[in-house]
Structure formats: structure tokens, C-alpha cells
Amino acid sequence: MLALRLARGSHPLVLLRRLCVALAAAGTGFLMLSTIGHAAGHPSAADESLLRLLWCTAPLAATAQFAVSTARTDPAARLQRGMTAAGLGPLRLTLLATVSTTLTCVLGVLVALLVFLRLRGDLGGPSAVRFDADLLGVGHPLPLVGALMLLATVPLTAAVATAVALRPRHEAGDAETEGSPRIAPPSGLPWGIAMAAAGLAIEAYTSRGTGAHGGLLPLPGRLISSPPGVLAGWALSTFGLVLAGPGLVHLCGRLLCAGRPGALRLLSGRVLQEESHRLGRPLGVLCAVGSAAYAAMKVYEASPSRPFGLLTAIGAAVVLACVTASALTAALESRSARARTTAALRRLGASASVLYRAAALRALALVIVLAPLTWTVAEMATLPLVH
């Protein structure tokens, strides 16, 4: 009940973020329901249905990440003193955020279920003519219990991810707010680069001859056969970019502070170094997804006879929207965390234009470093497949 009351009294922007989480959960739930419909309509094609279900893990992970990012920026999670005075400790705050995330995702998957049943014609009306019957399993009984159990994985995954990310951390220096030591610089940059390089090498080795056999990377709307080594290489490269994200953001800050920086460069660089842990992972995921999307477009441009399917478009839209929204939410969280520092700078005489120019310089530095790296990884990933 407390989660519902807080949702009713939330700011419109907070409600908008939760609505976006519900829409992401609805898109992921619709993809999962389509796998159930395909399995019901093609009982003999179990391998194909299983592959379609495995492809749903990408939007499921993106939805969970977006749900965690939204829970981090929830005002109730940041007002710890007031909540503690009201009798809600750190553990109960985590439970409250988990319940709110679960309710939001449950709302989304219920909407997906209603839309799916309406398109199939199971709610007392004709089935949708514009949709392929194979995607919905029209004319075949839908196992409702199995569909509900599969849909339950969306709010369950988001709830577990939120509980793990927002769990109370008891540290020795919790009482020291101002005299706490600095956070150590990220150490995952060399490991991330090594993983990305290893993934590209695995893909180059295992993709020999796949072009001649038509074994390009399949997506769940059209193609089924898939070279496992190519998928493993892509996955390893993706994890490498995600792991290297905090180190890359910290490197951007170091580059801005290199030489004899002025006040603007020094301020921008220090902020990037301090916020590398908070911004690095969402930006790393965004770079990985952007690299994979660019590589997939390049691969399928080389094979025009294999167009993207409807499920591929829905899944790609969910993943891209979630990772972009997660990166923007992380930037908003970083801005909220620096509220005291910004207020101190304003009291010292820093104008608003200086702060805006510092933010623009940080964004420009991130684009200059991350965009070429993302493009390079995508190009190297597609070279063995299109040549």
C-alpha cells in the first residue's frame, strides 16, 4: 500500500519514468508471448521456438537495467533521513523500491497479455489481419499457465536486479560523510579491452565459410540457423565494452585534465573521474548495443534477401530505448549526486553558463572517445561476416 501511495503522490517526471519501464516490460512480455504462440502453432519446431525464446534475454536484460536505473533515481530511495525517521530503514527502503519495480513491471506484462490475446482474437473478436498468424499462433490453443509463468520472469528479473543493486551496504566509513576516502579509479579497462579483443578473435576464427552457407547472424523474425562461435564472439565483445565502460569514462576525465588545464577543463575532467563508476556501466552498455546494432545492419545489408522480421524490430526497439533511457537516467542521477557541489560552486561565484559549458565539454569528450571506439568494434565484428 505504501508503494501505491508514493506512486500516487509522485512527480509527473517520476511517473513518466515508471510508465516507460512499464512499456519496456510490455514489449518484452509481448516478445515472450510470441514465442509461446509460435511453439503452440509449430509443435515440431521446438528448436526454433527455443531460439526465439533465447533471443528474448536481450530485451529482458535491458528492461531489468532500465528498471534498476529508474529505482535508483526514485525520490523515496534518496530521502533516507526522512524515511528513516518514518521508520523505514535501508532494508525496508530496498524492499519498497523492489515492490514498486515489481508492480510497474506487472502492469506492463498484463497490458502485453491483453494486447496479445486481443490480436489473437481470444477476447471475443476477429484476429488482427496485419499481423502474421505464425507470430501469434492464431487458431491454436494458448497454454495460459505457461504464458503466465513465462511473463512472471519479467517482473521477477527486474525485482531481483533492483534488490541486488539497491541492497544496503554496511561500510566502515558510513558515518564519515565528508572525510570519506576517494573512490579508487576503475580497474576494468584492460580486462574489458582484452575481452573485446578475444571476442573479435573468436568471431573471426569461427566465421570462416559462414557466408557461403548463408549462416549469417539470425534474428527471431526470419532466420533460424546460427554459427554459435559468432554469437559467442559477439557476446564476449559486448561484455568487454560493458566492463571497460567505467575505465573509459575515467580516461576521458584524465584526458581533459592532461597538460595545463584551465578551470573549465579541470572541472569537467574531475567530474568525469568522480562519476566514472556511476556513468561507466550504462554508457558501456549503450556503446555495446550501438555496436551490435550497427554490426547487425551491416551484416543484413550484405544479405538483402533476409529482411528483418517484426519481432526483430520490436526487440531492437525495446533494447535501444531501454539502454538509451538508462544512460540518460544515470546522467540525471549523477546530476542529483553533485547537487551540493554545484550549489557550492554557485556560492563561490560560478555562473550558470560556466556550468553548462562544463557539462557540454564532458558530453563532447565522451562522444569523441566512445563513438570511434564503438564504430571500430562494430566494423571489426562485421569484417569476417561480410567479406
Predicted features, each with a name:
Residues 1-28, 44-46, 57-70, 183-387:
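Hydrophobic multi-pass inner-membrane translocation pores used for secretion
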Residues 36-46:
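Short, hydrophobic transmembrane alpha-helix segments
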